[in-house]
Amino acid sequence: MQTRNTFSWIREEITRSISVLLMIYIITWASISSAYPIFAQQNYENPREATGRIVCANCHLASKPVDIEVPQAVLPDTVFEAVVKIPYDMQLKQVLANGKKGALNVGAVLILPEGFELAPPDRISPEMKEKIGNLSFQNYRPNKKNILVIGPVPGQKYSEITFPILAPDPATNKDVHFLKYPIYVGGNRGRGQIYPDGSKSNNTVYNATAGGIINKILRKEKGGYEITIVDASNERQVIDIIPRGLELLVSEGESIKLDQPLTSNPNVGGFGQGDAEIVLQDPLRVQGLLFFLGSVVLAQIFLVLKKKQFEKVQLSEMNF
């Protein structure tokens, strides 16, 4: 009987521990989800909508610039650099999930043409490896090797992210052709404002959910506020919860309207997207162009020599 009770107690403890770990995981995931492009993997099959909008913008509401640099043309089965630039003021600090201020991280999603993919380590030159640093890239999906994600990574070190890309070879991949292709990029700096479930993070403005008089502002022990709003017309009370890390714009006794901002906007980051074009060049076409240019140069040389020879003949005839 005692053994049975012991096993029952052990089973309950294991179940309780698993439940606690699961809750910690859910809370932690909720606090960071949708903060960087890499988390879009968990919610969207494709990061680029039919309208051309990259889904990271659903959670990063502020618009910021992003730029991409790629070669104008590449040869098949060669490795090239795609450099994504995510500029921002390095002196800025953002509100973290715990309410404290910290440095901004960055992330990016790179949408390549079908057939283009992350270059294998043995094809990357030492010079390119030095530019890449300690970055670790991932495929957006196992079956989508042409879509790469990175982040979050420290923005002060990686405001420029170098992707090593392997160009496809139409000789071995019949779905690839020698054409001009588009490349799309999305990049963000800082945390998002909206979580995937639609709830707000503590990196955005909180507005009043009702109009009336602010009856009470309670500062919570672990940070944040409870703001009690009383509707003067019907004495109905509404409590708005403000998470930690935000600065209040209102005070007790103040009259406010529906949707009036209760806090300042703490967001200093944002998301941007851009595009570029790259040509997968046929080596035979390049050779043909070089042959043509060589022929033109030779023709010009022969023309000059012929002209000089003609001038010499004319000069000798005049002397004769």
From Swiss-Prot:
PROSITE patterns reported for this sequence: CYTF (PS51010)
Residues involved in heme binding: 36, 56, 59-60
Gene3D superfamilies per UniProt: 2.40.50.100, Cytochrome f large domain (2.60.40.830), Single helix bin (1.20.5.700)
Cited function: Component of the cytochrome b6-f complex, which mediates electron transfer between photosystem II (PSII) and photosystem I (PSI), cyclic electron flow around PSI, and state transitions.
Quaternary organization: The 4 large subunits of the cytochrome b6-f complex are cytochrome b6, subunit IV (17 kDa polypeptide, petD), cytochrome f and the Rieske protein, while the 4 small subunits are PetG, PetL, PetM and PetN. The complex functions as a dimer.
HAMAP family, per database record: Cytb6_f_cytF (MF_00610)
Name of the protein in its database record: Cytochrome f
The gene coding this protein: petA
